[in-house]
Amino acid sequence: MSFNHKTIEELHDLLVAKEISATELTQKTLEDIKSREEAVGSFITVSEEAALKQAAAIDAKGIDADNLMSGIPLAVKDNISTKGTLTTAASKMLYNYEPIFDATSVANAYAKDMIVIGKTNMDEFAMGGSTETSYFKKTKNAWDHTKVPGGSSGGSATAVASGQVRLSLGSDTGGSIRQPAAFNGVVGLKPTYGTVSRYGLIAFGSSLDQIGPFAPTVKENAQLLNVIASSDVKDATSAPVRIADYTSKIGRDIKGMKIALPKEYLGEGIDPEIKETVLAAAKQFEALGATVEEVSLPHSKYGVAVYYIIASSEASSNLQRFDGIRYGFRADDAKNLDEIYVNTRSQGFGDEVKRRIMLGTFSLSSGYYDAYFKKAGQVRTLIIEDFDKVFADYDLILGPTTPTVAFGLDTLNHDPVAMYLADLLTIPVNLAGLPGISIPAGFVDGLPVGLQLIGPKYAEETIYQAAAAFETVTDYHKQQPIIFGGDK
């Protein structure tokens, strides 16, 4: 018997009633991972021994009836530090790295007696939109194994979509939670910048990165955010704001809610069928009592250019620490210190990571800083101001998560610009530090379409309220791929 169709609340009730034990649930989850892993390749590391040991300890002390997450398995993206467990960021550079500490988000999960079942595949150092830049393997879409799962958190999304786990953690720098959530038909949230501590997250773009949850439903996503969100003295960018319960507005109606639909989000480059899906969703929100009106975000069209200057510049700085001296990969053909640095970085980083380091180094270099990095920061401010103007009059922004459905494996990984444009609709949210969610909203050619809801800072409760209301009048979140036992 598999438990992967049961919600977290249903699993909790079974655990409290002692109809199953944490050990049995963990064993079944491990079986689900193993039976599907060859098809989708979601995991870099499966922590079987450690997970079963933790489950046995939870069983020994007993399930806490007041702790919803007690005994629940969790998959964690492989750029989030886990003490004593490989944390590779899907890079040769960190192929043997075992942290001596847990990321705060992982520590928060352990504090709630969650069981870390394994580490999921991703684009190397979270740089990519297809999980094809991983040093270890290419993850495949849960709905069509010839398509990409999205990225960079492709393994975390596919693990949930394929029924390997119920919950997972990812990170989002320019869409890396929302895009794979859309491609795999699950719920993925990028919280407000600073809501979840970045301590223990292997840094890519420090002003953009944010850890967030994946789940099959809106409520379960909010329940996981309740666990991982916290203020943290170990993270200087951690926000002091802490919502008591992110599920508090789920179930409320949305009558009177004002939702903005930017005309730029349905313009050039957006698949016509995705546009139709979003417009149909807008009608659903109106039927639920919300007002949906067209607005403009005029500077959003510059988002991709701004993002790749800022993110690459921050990456070139953050990745300077990987030099073969203290930990990780070291080239064995070096004859002096200079060759250790050069050979280690040349051999340890993949092509996409090296491309971004070079772009970032150029943008920060003397003579080009003002023309590129400084200018990008100025345009970023204009993008933020556009959002501020809209949120002065509206509660949420609605639009597609991605311009297309999942594309084929090995189709865009040799065309960096085309790959970058796949994040066209998610990037502005990171630049502004806003919360955004992707929820299942339909299908095009048998592949899931994601609907994105964006809110002002710390409006996760309102986002969840609207997203959950949409779930009540649609069944897209209930449809599952064949690998999960569905009929698609």
Curated annotation (Swiss-Prot):
Q: Which Pfam families match?
A: Amidase (PF01425)
Entry's Gene Ontology BP terms: translation
Q: State the GO CC annotations.
A: glutamyl-tRNA(Gln) amidotransferase complex
Q: Which reaction does it catalyse?
A: L-glutamyl-tRNA(Gln) + L-glutamine + ATP + H2O = L-glutaminyl-tRNA(Gln) + L-glutamate + ADP + phosphate + H(+)
Q: Which InterPro entries match?
A: Amidase, Amidase_CS, Amidase_dom, AS_sf, GatA
Q: Does the keyword Phosphoprotein apply?
A: no
Keyword Nucleotide-binding attached: yes
Q: Which UniProt keywords apply?
A: ATP-binding, Ligase, Nucleotide-binding, Protein biosynthesis
Q: Which residues form the active site?
A: K77 (charge relay system), S152 (charge relay system), S176 (acyl-ester intermediate)
GO MF entries: ATP binding; glutaminyl-tRNA synthase (glutamine-hydrolyzing) activity
Q: What is its EC number?
A: 6.3.5.7
Please explain the role this protein plays, according to its UniProt record. Answer: Allows the formation of correctly charged Gln-tRNA(Gln) through the transamidation of misacylated Glu-tRNA(Gln) in organisms which lack glutaminyl-tRNA synthetase. The reaction takes place in the presence of glutamine and ATP through an activated gamma-phospho-Glu-tRNA(Gln).
| Listed NCBIfam families | gatA
Family annotation (HAMAP family): GatA (MF_00120)
The text of the family note is: Belongs to the amidase family. GatA subfamily.
Q: How would you summarize the oligomeric state and partners of this protein?
A: Heterotrimer of A, B and C subunits.
| Name under which the protein is recorded | Glutamyl-tRNA(Gln) amidotransferase subunit A
* Source species of the chain: Streptococcus pyogenes serotype M2 (strain MGAS10270)
What would be the name of the gene that encodes this protein? Answer: gatA
